[in-house]
């Protein structure tokens, strides 16, 4: 299968000619995913996820999350934190963890959930909005043209895209009165960053759990995952 059910047509036909039983999904993987998500009950999905964080994944996920928050002092009284959601599983999980933290924390802090649309297709945008609704996350979505800006950049487009995304998130969060942004990078991302720096750049680079912004005074980046 493929995303839209077009590229997989020829592959399925070729496999059938070779004697295999092969099919191409009508509308592709995205159409199947939208249909599957539509069958799910939003309230039941939210409750199931929240219960799993409190019980099944309490030690593995929740306790490690709160341990990082305490150890690195990532959340302080009266903080206003912009939890940045890309639409992937890591940032969605982080958003649910912050919801739980706000319920059980000893001191007050505010949380804003942000989704930056860098130029997603309508299908991807619809999936992200649907997942937010199912998980009970009220997020503010703002649009940018980052994908269009880096489309023709031949050298290090991913680096430029990441830098631009970070800048937009800082700027929008600051306008909302936030003093921190939270990103969903985790331990695997740290290892990948170190290895990529060593293999491609002959240097050791890593990700810090918290980082003060140089371009946005008073803003701080935190990585509680």
Over which residues does each language-model region extend?
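ATP-dependent adenylation/nucleotidyltransferase module used to activate substrates
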Residues: 41-212
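Rhodanese-like catalytic fold shared by cysteine-dependent sulfurtransferases
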Residues: 3-53
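Short active-site oxyanion
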Residues: 20, 179-180, 219-223
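The conserved beta1-alpha1 loop
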Residues: 2-3, 86
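Short, flexible loop segments at boundaries between secondary-structure elements
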Residues: 206-225
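Short, structured coil segments at secondary-structure junctions
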Residues: 18-20, 135-136, 217
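Hydrophobic residues at beta-strand termini and immediately following loops
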Residues: 25, 142, 222-224
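Short, charged, surface-exposed secondary-structure boundary motifs
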Residues: 32-36, 150-151, 215-217
């Amino acid at each position: 299968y493929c995303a839209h059910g077009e590229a997989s047509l020829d592959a399925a036909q070729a496999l059938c000619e070779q004697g295999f039983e092969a099919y191409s999904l009508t509308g592709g993987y995205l159409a199947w995913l939208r249909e599957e998500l539509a069958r799910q009950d939003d309230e039941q999905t939210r409750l199931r996820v929240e219960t799993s964080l409190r019980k099944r994944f309490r030690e593995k996920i929740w306790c490690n999350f709160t341990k990082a928050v305490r150890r690195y002092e990532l959340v302080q009284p009266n903080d206003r934190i912009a939890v940045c959601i890309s639409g992937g599983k890591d940032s969605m999980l982080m958003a649910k963890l912050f919801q739980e933290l706000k319920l059980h924390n000893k001191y007050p802090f505010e949380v804003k959930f942000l989704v930056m649309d860098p130029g997603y297709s309508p299908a991807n945008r619809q999936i992200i909005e649907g997942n937010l609704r199912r998980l009970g996350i009220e997020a503010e979505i703002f649009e940018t043209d980052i994908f269009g800006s880096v489309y023709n950049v031949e050298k290090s487009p991913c680096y430029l895209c990441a830098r631009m995304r970070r800048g937009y998130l800082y700027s929008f969060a600051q306008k909302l009165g936030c003093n921190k942004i939270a990103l969903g990078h985790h331990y695997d991302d740290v290892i990948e960053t170190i290895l990529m720096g060593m293999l491609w750049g002959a240097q050791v680079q890593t990700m810090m759990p918290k980082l003060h912004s140089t371009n946005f005074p008073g803003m701080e980046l935190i990585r509680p995952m």
